Swiss-Prot record:
Coiled coil: none
Protein name: Diacylglycerol kinase 1
Species assigned in the record: Arabidopsis thaliana
Record's miscellaneous remark: Treatment with (E)-2-hexenal, (Z)-3-hexenal and allo-ocimene increases plant resistance against the necrotrophic fungal pathogen Botrytis cinerea.
Topology term for the membrane: Single-pass membrane protein
Stretches for region Disordered: 265-296, 308-336
Quaternary structure (record): Monomer.
Catalytic activity of the protein: a 1,2-diacyl-sn-glycerol + ATP = a 1,2-diacyl-sn-glycero-3-phosphate + ADP + H(+)
């Protein structure tokens, strides 16, 4: 009892036995809780509005400073490149003209369901405002300027992957992030991504002259000082065509005389340098005679006044098959027929002039239909990091040839393919057709579904790996420091019973499949063609693959498969297992999104060699149905090894589905012959181990040695191939 009295003295409301008091106390507590919650929400809303007003005041301050004649920058005007975007994507965006919010709630009529978005700098504008927008977009050409100058602008988007180090003012080293109480408005350079306070800009401009060094990606960026805008004069088209053709003819003749003179003077040296390339002299003469203008140090393709290559003109080139092993002795960077030359040139707005010999720009190809179809956002992020001129979008009407034509006179450049395995093969085919003396090495940004080639080159299995590697900026830096390796390419000929080709040959980089796996790929391909909107993410793509595979489990379509195909490897007949429902010929160690079919660590098969993507040998395995494919995917089973060899024949005795690198079709009875076609240079992300860094450094040293004419392109190619073989 005494204890109850003491407890009641300390907590009278809790221990009161009066029900009315209890209800009142609970009501009071609930009221206090609601009041506290409302207060917190009010404070949060006030803080949000405060922050929003601060950001808006910053934007207005920057806009006012840009209108100040004394503060205008000496940069050529560049209009925005507008495209339509749904208003749902306008969240947290302000119009770059009226500075009003573009939130979706303000879309009242149907005409306002879209807005204009700049594909280069990310600026947004209302329909009625876009025509009045200031011409302060990224200026891709600064020909005539002595130095690249900063292009200060409002940071309309966060897609530039800002790092912690770049969030400070480049002049005063103070933080550029806004505080709760405000702060100083900032500018962001569209080239180097550095930030500067608007108040600091005048002092910085007086001290440095606003010279921009293009930032940490300067070697990959196509410098605007060397990008020249093409001027077209329709009225003088015929006369200019004649003049242009005469200039080309004179330039080519002069170059031939110089080459012959150089060969006379350096006969012994050339024969020692080229080694066994003498047998290709007739072939090189033939190839240069039947093509249009070719490019090297003296072979000017456009204007004779523009020369972007210097070096020995007697270096090797690729043979008629585009192979890397044997190269003719005439140096050139690319070949185009007259019709193709004029057709490609008409599609370009710019050309490259007087690039320095140590330039290493990156040529980017994007296939926005690959995988999750995120090409638009990826393109805009690349426009922010690089020069928009060096970024090309692939489509059914424009292939890689246009970009390669623009870069045809660049002695050393690298290629980035943003897409899947099919896109990578498309670009490799186009590179091979140009007969580059120094073929560019290719890196892959995995934007497809399986991304098998990207996996074996350490670039990851999807766009999620880009963020895990530190963002797009880090990936671009990894490309600059990547090691060059080689990839075997295989020619697949489709022959009838008489040995005649039924269609042009196809080329394989990853694998070729016949049977159940090709059937699943064909079903997915048809579904994508009918309903492309269903393939909006890499995960959903794999779910659809799994669904189609599950359907095929109950379908015994390939129970007679072992008697419908005959396999021959290096002239030896290979027995197809009776439970086989598919045959796979693999060139790389990744299939169907990361499945290792050969498994080099497996010691069960002692009579087989480890798999390699540049040993000029393919591996043949069998799979026993779609259920087996599913178990391979989760690591519960293994493919059955059948053979290894350099020449494979697969005879189809019945109509069967076939796929090459994920591109499927139904094939009537025929014979598929697979033979080694050549090798392509690829970029492999350097691992953390010292060996990976050493390979990247050696690659850079060899490129510099070729630039300084210590070695020629043929010698560099041979050394790179040898290095790739020894370091694997």
């Amino acid at each position: 009892m005494d204890d109850d009295g003491e407890l009641g003295m300390f907590f009278p409301s809790w221990t009161s036995k009066n029900p009315i008091d209890t209800v009142e106390s609970r009501g009071l507590m609930f009221s206090c809780f609601v009041a506290a919650l409302v207060g917190i929400l009010t404070i949060a809303y006030t803080a949000f509005q405060w922050r929003r007003n601060i950001n808006l005041s910053w934007t207005k301050a920057i806009a006012r400073s840009k209108k100040n004649p004394k503060a205008r920058h000496k940069v050529p005007v560049a209009p925005h490149s507008w495209e339509l975007d749904p208003i749902a994507r306008a969240k947290n965006l302000n119009c770059c003209v009226c500075l009003k919010s573009m939130s979706p709630s303000q879309a009242i009529v149907a005409s306002e369901s879209f807005f204009h978005r700049c594909t280069i700098c990310g600026a947004a504008a209302h329909f009625n405002c876009s025509s009045s927008a200031p011409k302060d977009c990224k200026c891709v050409s600064m020909v005539g300027f002595e130095h690249v100058v900063h292009q200060w602008a409002v940071r309309w988007t966060e897609g530039a992957d800002q790092t912690d180090d770049s969030s400070f003012c480049s002049y005063c080293d103070e933080s550029c992030s806004s505080s709760f109480l405000g702060g100083s408005p900032i500018w962001c350079c569209l080239w180097c991504q550095r930030l500067v306070h608007v108040d600091c800009h005048s002092n910085m401009s007086n001290e440095t002259g606003d010279i921009c060094d293009l930032g940490p990606l300067r070697r990959l960026i196509l410098c605007p000082l060397y990008v020249k805008e093409l001027t077209r004069n329709p009225s003088g088209g015929f006369l200019s065509s004649i003049t242009h053709g005469a200039n080309e003819l004179a330039s080519t003749a002069l170059a031939s005389i110089r080459i012959q003179s150089k060969k006379y003077k350096q006969t012994n040296e050339t024969s020692a340098d080229t080694g066994n390339s003498g047998s290709n002299c007739d072939e090189s003469t033939e190839s240069t005679a039947d093509t249009g203008p070719t490019v090297n140090g003296a072979h000017a393709v456009l204007e004779n006044s523009i020369s972007v290559m210097n070096g020995d003109s007697s270096n090797g080139d690729s043979d008629s098959n585009g192979k890397l092993e044997k190269k003719p002795s005439v140096k050139r960077t690319g070949s185009f027929g007259q019709k193709e030359y004029h057709a490609l040139r008409s599609k370009l707005k710019y050309e490259l002039a007087d690039l320095p010999s140590d330039a290493r720009p990156l040529l980017v190809f994007i296939n926005k239909k690959s995988g999750a179809q995120r090409g638009d956002s990826l393109r805009q992020r690349l426009h922010l990091h690089l020069n928009p001129v060096q970024v090309f979008e692939l489509s059914s009407v424009q292939g890689p040839e246009v970009g390669l034509f623009l870069f045809r006179k660049v002695p050393h450049f690298r290629v980035l393919v943003c897409g899947g395995d099919g896109t990578a093969g498309w670009v490799l085919d186009a590179i091979e057709k140009q007969n580059f003396i120094s073929p560019p090495a290719v890196a892959i940004l995995p934007a497809g579904t399986g991304n098998d080639l990207s996996r074996v080159l350490n670039w990851g299995g999807g766009l999620g790996s880009v963020e895990r590697q530190g963002g797009l900026s880090t990936v671009l830096q990894n490309i600059e420091h990547a090691a060059v390796t080689v990839l075997d390419r295989w020619k697949v000929s489709i022959l009838n019973q008489q040995g005649k080709q039924l269609q042009p040959p196809k080329y394989m980089n990853n694998y070729i499949g016949v049977g159940c796996d090709a059937k699943v790929a064909l079903e997915i391909h048809n579904l994508r063609e009918e309903n492309p909107e269903r393939f909006y993410s890499q995960f959903m793509n794999k779910v659809l693959y799994a669904r189609e595979g599950a359907r095929s489990i109950m379908d015994r379509t390939f129970e007679d498969f072992p008697w419908q195909v005959r396999v021959e490897v290096d002239g030896v007949d290979i027995e197809v297992p009776e439970d086989a429902e598919g045959i796979l010929v693999a060139n790389i160690g990744s299939y169907m999104g990361g499945v290792d079919l050969w498994q080099n660590e497996d010691e069960t098969y002692e009579n087989f060699d480890p798999q390699s993507m540049h040993d000029k040998i393919v591996e043949v395995v069998s799979i026993s149905g779609t259920w087996h494919l599913g178990k391979l995917q989760v690591g519960l089973s293994r493919a059955r090894r059948l053979a290894q060899g350099s020449a494979v024949k697969i005879q189809l005795c019945a109509p069967l589905p076939v796929q090459i690198d994920g591109e499927p079709w139904n094939q009537q009875p025929c014979t598929l012959t697979i033979s080694h076609h050549g090798q392509a240079f690829m970029l492999k992300r350097a691992a953390e181990e010292p060996l990976g860094h050493a390979a990247a450094i050696i690659t850079d040293v060899l490129e510099n040695a070729e630039t300084n004419q210590v070695i020629n392109a043929s010698q560099k190619r041979t050394l790179l191939q040898e290095m790739a073989l020894r370091l694997t």
